[in-house]
Amino acid sequence: MLSLLSDNWRLVLSMVLALLIGWNIRVPVFKMAILKNFVDKPNKRSSHTGCVPNSGGIVVFLAFLCSFLLFVRFDSRPEFQYVLLGAILIFLVGIYDDLLEISPRKKVKGEMLGVLVLIVGGGFYLTNLHGFLSFYEISPWVGIPLTFVGLVGLINAINLIDGIDGLCSGMAMIDCIFFGIWFYYCGHIEYALMCGGLTAALIPFFLINLFGKRSKMFMGDSGALMVGFLLGVMAIRFCETDINLKGICAVEAAPGVVFSVLAIPV
């Protein structure tokens, strides 16, 4: 099926599917959250007065997952199976925290497990800083710890900004669009599909989070942690760019560019 579609059609259809799934499941997920008392209750630090469903992350995750599974060619990107497994693990950690409010230590341990699956299983880590701070090629002894700390830190940074309506999802969409356009023009189509799918999956949540009244939902840790993880994957892949590429794909000091793109959460 995928072999019959051009890369452009795969990209368009993956985004359309993620958008449609997110839009159509938002109401059932909202009702399920109310029924199961899966809500964020107001406290002294809350800006909302009533109980708001904490299930927006479920909408984003399911929409992205369906798009990712149906349109990405895993045979061309073997590391994607570990990206998917890591994202699922971190999503489940977030769901568990949203429901039971686990300790920060346990939550971070779960995040670390998801990141380790990606690094160890997928061999996915930094190998070159492209002149950032005058460093170029780095050994795995440096690249693996740097990737590990960077991913765990970014996951929690994204989670921390998920306190204002539309901020986390809005920033994530901007970052995804930047990375997605770059991946597309540089020929990294599978990563462009990941960026496009996540952007489209975030749109329905962004609208109901920012403009919803009776159907308002929060993203919750399940969504924020998973989005942070996927943004980290995009950032690492961006940093692993071939420094000899020309035109729009040529990136000097790629980690510095990543810091600029992710400036607000970081």
What are these regions (language model features)?
Residues 2-5, 30-61, 95-113, 135-139, ...:
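Interhelical loop and helix-boundary elements at the membrane-water interface
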Residues 137-147, 252-256:
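Membrane-interfacial loop-to-helix junctions in multi-pass transporters
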Residues 39-49, 67-77, 126-136, 152-161, ...:
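Short juxtamembrane and helix-loop transition motifs at transmembrane-helix boundaries
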Residues 53-69, 116-121:
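A generic, lipid-embedded transmembrane alpha helix
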Residues 2-32, 37, 61-88, 92, ...:
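Alpha-helical transmembrane segments
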Residues 128-140, 245-250:
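Interhelical loops and loop-helix junctions of multi-pass membrane transporters/channels
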Residues 88-93, 110, 114-125, 146-156, ...:
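Membrane-embedded alpha-helical core segments of multi-pass
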Residues 45-47, 87-89, 145-146, 151-153, ...:
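Short hydrophobic "helix-edge" motifs at membrane interfaces and signal-peptide entry regions
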